[in-house]
Each structure stands twice: as C-alpha cells, then as structure tokens.
C-alpha cells in the first residue's frame, strides 16, 4: 500500500486517489528564460520516477507540468536581447525539451503555457475580488488580501503573526498590507506590447502565483490528488496557490467538510554543489547540457535517485563517478546472459516484494536501488535457468525506474564521456596487438598494452577460449 509524505500534514499518509485507479498530478515546471540547470533536472527526474511507479502500480495518471512563459525575468532577458518574448521563450522551451529527452524522461501528458491561460487567470482573479479576497490598488495592480484568509499558512506552518513582511516583499504604493501579493500587474509604459493583455483592471499581465492556480484548476479540476515541486516553492508559491484556489472556490472560510485544493503535496530537496549552495556568483552553477557532456544520462538519473527525493543532495563529479560505478555493477550482472528479457513482476516473489515495499514507502528509491544491488549479487551467484530468471527480474524491476534497459555491453563500453578519447575501434586495435604479442610469447608487451589501456580508463577481462572483453573503468 503506497504511502506518501504529505507536506500539508507533515506526515506519511496512505495514498487514496479521489477516483479509484486514477491519479491527477500537477508539477510546477520551468520559467523559460535560460537553459535548465541540475536543480531543474532533479525536479524532472523525481516526478518522472513518481509517475513511472504510479503507472507500474496500475494507476492511470494524468501528469501536468506547466511552463511559465511570462515573468519579470523573461521580460528583462528579452529586452537585453532585443527580441520578442515569444522568440526567447520558444527557444528555451525547445532547449528544455532537448535536455529532458536526452535524460530519457517521459513527456508530461499536458504542458500548459501560462500565456495560453490568461482568460482563466482573469476569471479566477475576478472570483477572488467577488469573494472580497482581492482588491485593486492605487497603482493599478490587483492584490490578494492575505490577512482576510484565516487559514493562510497551512502548508508552510507559518502564522500571520510570524510572517515577517520585510523578508517577503517591500510594501508598494498599491498594497494595503505588506503581506499581500500581486495577482495582476498593471502594465508599465516602458514594457513591450507583447507583455500585456487587456483586462477588467486595465492592461497588464498575471502574477506568477495565479498562473499555476488557474492552469491546474482548468486542467485537473478544483480538487485533485498530487501537487509537486521543489522545496523552495513551498513558501510562498504553493502557499499562495492554496490561498487563491480555495479562496476562489470557497471564499474566506472553507468549511471542514469542503474538499481541499490538493490532497497530497510533495516537495523534492535542494541540490548543493560541493557542499555549497548552487549559484552563478560562486561559479558552481551547472547546466544539464554541460553535465551531459561528461556523464551518461542514465548515470545522472541514477545519481539523483540514489538519494531519497525529499533529502538534499550534494552534486560533485566524485558523486557522479560513484553513481557510474554503481550502475556498472548492475549492468555487469547482466553480461554473458543471452537475451535477457524482462519478466512480469510478481509481488509474491521476495525480490519484487522488497522492491515494491521500498517504493511504496514514500518512493524510497535508495532502498529500492539497494534491492537491485542485492539481486545483482544473486544473479552473479546463480546458474542456468535460475540465473536467466533472476536477470530478467533485475531488468524488469530496474525498468520501473528507467534503469538497465540498454544492452549491457553498450553501457559498459560507453563509460564516462570525459575519458581519454579512445574510440571503440582504437581499443579493439590495441586488444588485437595484445593478442598477437601473447601468441608471440612477448608477455611483457602484452602486459604493457593492458597497463596502458588501464591508464586510459579501459579494463580488459580475459575469458575462456582466448576471448578478451573490455569496458571503460
């Protein structure tokens, strides 16, 4: 039975979908003004894993991940580049899709762009004004009146008295209270024409928080199963989403028997780089595409899922090399077994049960991967039909996390992308020269070739019958 840690309740809860057998899930996606970094990769990989396991468990999943394609940062970058907003955002949406595809991730079922949902956002803002939870200030902005919603702070655990307005937002001329946040930003004279839309409150554009409320409610309904995102979005973004969505539906006082906006809130942990916060100023800011120049996409996914999704993780080349070594162990167990086919996962099987128990415990991928390592050791010990069956089970269980689906030799010979640069053909030439040296009984030369290849990250393994296999270290 699946249990999910719900940020809202601060506890693990048995997962009970609103409609039996069906799951509606919304994840906050990217703001597209630059290339995606490894923090974005973690969000993509974590919720890709969640969807895969839900589907493997028999659920029909509707997976929605939005794109923020209008935002202050987007406007600033477009002005710097002297290009239209749409040209900038389309370019980085294409780059995001390319990164996601190279990582081997599934596409969301729906990927709404904020600019396609302006009408829905305006409708929700109008409802909040009608419910006396929003107002238009003197500067033309429409703001949410935070203090009028008594339950504000339920997700973050912050009370209105605890909130420090100075830390959140500087009070503007149009706000009645420093805690209030903007729903609709009035257009400024210097802003481009493609950043403004007509509205009942004058020309302007939506605030960031209202975008996700409107898109999720339009596509999934006012009450759905799972909302996910990075831990940094818990407050204020997700807190504000709850305020807007429930405020529009129920007004100022949601009753106990009223359905909440979302049943389960999931948040993945931060990424640190060499034990420091990732930032451009520290020079430790890594783009997905740059990481993939040095490391195999499957290695990057394995690195991300070796840690529990809620835990912070430390990014370093050493950690990625460790992940590569771990995957190498698993793939090595599948070598020398003809035609390893996946097998149906029978939860009566003790290996499958251990794996499923781990995944059903709040998607505990570290424990699930530990089961894969134990199973790989058993594959190495087994013989005959049992070895074939266990290898198929290893491939099947790994496949639920999108691991171990390649030809083992292909993975083992791919190695790290920042190796010496020896091609497969060059390595085979060295192996042929070593075979010739051994046949000529020049064992010193043969050993020298082995050592030279090892220094360049290539491991040779002599097999019965005079066969030599190789893999990258």
From Swiss-Prot:
The keyword Flavoprotein does not apply. GO terms for biological process: cysteinyl-tRNA aminoacylation. It catalyses: tRNA(Cys) + L-cysteine + ATP = L-cysteinyl-tRNA(Cys) + AMP + diphosphate. It is found in: Cytoplasm. Zn(2+) binds at residues 28, 212, 237, 241. CDD domains: Anticodon_Ia_Cys, CysRS_core. Its cofactor is Zn(2+). Keywords: Aminoacyl-tRNA synthetase, ATP-binding, Cytoplasm, Ligase, Metal-binding, Nucleotide-binding, Protein biosynthesis, Zinc. A motif ('KMSKS' region) lies at residues 277-281. The lineage of its organism: Bacteria, Pseudomonadati, Pseudomonadota, Betaproteobacteria, Burkholderiales. The keyword Transmembrane helix does not apply. One of its GO terms (cellular component) is cytosol. This is Cysteine--tRNA ligase. SMART domains: DALR_2 (SM00840). Its EC number is 6.1.1.16. One of its GO terms (molecular function) is cysteine-tRNA ligase activity. The gene is cysS. Monomer. Its main location: cytoplasm. Belongs to the class-I aminoacyl-tRNA synthetase family. Gene3D superfamilies: Cysteine-tRNA ligase, C-terminal anti-codon recognition domain (1.20.120.1910), HUPs (3.40.50.620). Binds 1 zinc ion per subunit. Signal peptide: none annotated. ATP binds at residue 280. A motif ('HIGH' region) lies at residues 30-40.
